[in-house]
Amino acid sequence: MTRTAESGMLVAAAGVAAFGVTLVILAGGQTIDSRIGLTFAVMVAAFGTVHMAIRRWAPSASTVILPPAALLTAISLAEIHRLDPVRAGLQQWWLLIAAGMTVALLFFLHHRGTAAIRRYRYLYLLTGMILLLLPLLPSTGPLPVRGLEVNGSRLWLVVDLGITEIRFQPGEIVKLLMVLFLAGYLAERQSALAERPRQLGPFKFPEPRQLFPVVAVWAVSLVVLVVQRDLGASALLFGAFIGMIYTATGRPTYLLIGGVLTASAGYGAYRLFDHVERRFLAWIQPFQNFEDAGYQVAQAWFGMGTGSLAGSGIGLGRPDLIPNAATDFIYAAVAEELGFAGSLAILAGFALLIGVGFGIALRCRDRFRKLTAAGLTWVLGLQAFLIIGGVLRLVPLTGITLPFMSYGGSSLVGNFLLLGLLARISHEEPA
């Protein structure tokens, strides 16, 4: 696909967002106003700016990275506008900020290249650990920065700027830093990790000392789970690492080890933390616990059940009855109002992004770039699976965001930077 065709698809995605907002306004019996043009302009400005930056500083990058992300964002803006117009306005501001930060990243990588960022892997680890601990700061006090607990998990950082406050979720940046650290670490130790001199029954295992990084990252994930009480970030962090180590070695033994450690950590969390137990109950018995833990999931299923093939129509359903519909349950809201067709569009968008990401990783000859591309794709894919799977009751609810769709500035920034890294890697390792 040419860059011209890519730009046309981005404009079309902006049109989808504007059309969706138009339907929301008409469904509410309101008069057509400037919100439609503003939504279109913000989409064109954000994705157009990133598109031009890629043309300038990564011209050989894949042309199939931005369009699916633009489609997902377009559907999201329309649905968030339907659920909460104030949040929709804030999401548009965050979209512009995310695009600006991605342009800055592409400019930096144009001058330094991905080889330069490989040298600072331990700095990424240190920075990531500091960011993970920042939400543990006291919620009150004289400091302009403080932690904030939401829904039983301590994930948020609040920065007081005097005239306003900014809430940010450091974990969205930590996932990128951890991928960069692990890619640098595994690129150096790929051969040693691939060796399997010890055998236990039908399974072959590497030397115990080679398993140290697996256990260490599992321990870090447990710290996140215990201290921040965040099941989603813990599962995402460890799952992405297991995916990366499997990519580096091609040994399914690591998937087995990762599965055992994940199951044991999940069981421990279920027994130790009330809010994790509630999420398991919502997963297993949502309708039996309708008045309590299962209310959110049950309402989501009722809504999706009314969606049928084409949905009730955007602005005509009742996704507002689902708690946290704009964040945790945006997929259920879209499924109700756009039906199976809208759900399929979301799944197709993620499938395309994941396929492109792994395709970039497979083409890479450099180990670091290969593992970075694979790690970023594992993060994106696992995050989408955990939240959509939670809504569909394939896995317990984790409370993480759906990339490019859930309301939240930190999520949008983190995922746009992820796209920027993938674009740069695909430029350096063209098809």
Each model region followed by its residue ranges:
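Juxtamembrane "helix-exit" motif on the non-cytosolic side of transmembrane helices
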Residues: 23-29, 80-83
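Long, low-complexity hydrophobic alpha-helices enriched in A/L/V/I and glycine
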Residues: 303, 309-310, 337, 407, ...
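Transmembrane helix boundary and interhelical junction motifs in multipass membrane proteins
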Residues: 230-235, 311-314, 325-327, 344, ...
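Hydrophobic alpha-helical transmembrane segments of multi-pass inner membrane proteins, especially
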Residues: 33-293, 332-390, 417-421
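N-terminal membrane topogenic signal
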Residues: 1-15, 61, 209
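Extracytosolic (periplasmic/ER-lumenal) interhelical loops and adjacent juxtamembrane/interface segments
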Residues: 159, 292-316
